[in-house]
Amino acid sequence: MTLDIVNWKAIVEALLYAAGDEGLTKKQLLSVLEVDEAELLDIMLDVKETYEKEDRGIELVEYADTYMLSTKKEFAVYLKKLIEAPSKGLSQAALEVLAIVSYKQPITRAEVEEIRGVKSERILQSLVAKALLCEVGRADGPGRAILYGTTETFLEQFGLKTLEELPPLPENVEEDGVQEEADLFFENFNQTFEDLK
């Protein structure tokens, strides 16, 4: 490929944005961009310098050969205000994500999205901001994806002492009844939530 450095930066930015808080490993970037390691390092250095020079709210960070976009520390006070601002109740989508995480934890964003069939990154971030979910570790394998789990706040908000008090999942559902199982699952979870209001 013979794109100029500006196009490479835009492509990398799009890839890292799509990857979210899990970021992308050097190996993944090399594979997707089809460049050699020296070219990748030049591209990533240029991306990093661009974020540092310009008045941007985000920066490029690297840890354990993984790159990700992160908010700059100097804007933490504003993020804190956002997190602490009063917010409306949970949407249907947020309840679905909470249900999935509460029963399947620890679980990665990709696994949540596979179950739901739609992107769930922003919902997960919102639930973390509301202190209903938190990072409980990192998955093994490439990228070391974040594992999510519920919090004490989740238990308090739903009137639970332990996760064992969650409504039981339907048992013995055939493979082609998975969608029906999911519908029952969310219906049961939502009913429990409504009962606690």
UniProtKB/Swiss-Prot annotation:
Q: Which GO terms describe its biological process?
A: cell division; chromosome separation; DNA replication
| One Pfam family per UniProt | SMC_ScpB
**What subcellular compartments does it reside in?**
Cytoplasm
What GO CC annotations are associated with the protein?
cytoplasm
Keyword check for Transmembrane, yes or no.
no
User: Which superkingdom heads the taxonomic lineage of this protein's source?
Assistant: Bacteria
Keywords associated with the record: Cell cycle, Cell division, Chromosome partition, Cytoplasm
Primary subcellular site in the record, as a coarse category: cytoplasm
Q: Tell me, in a sentence or two, what this protein's role is.
A: Participates in chromosomal partition during cell division. May act via the formation of a condensin-like complex containing Smc and ScpA that pull DNA away from mid-cell into both cell halves.
State how it assembles. Homodimer. Homodimerization may be required to stabilize the binding of ScpA to the Smc head domains. Component of a cohesin-like complex composed of ScpA, ScpB and the Smc homodimer, in which ScpA and ScpB bind to the head domain of Smc. The presence of the three proteins is required for the association of the complex with DNA.
Q: Which NCBIfam families match?
A: SMC-Scp complex subunit ScpB
- Recorded family membership: Belongs to the ScpB family.
Q: What is this protein called?
A: Segregation and condensation protein B
Gene encoding the protein: scpB
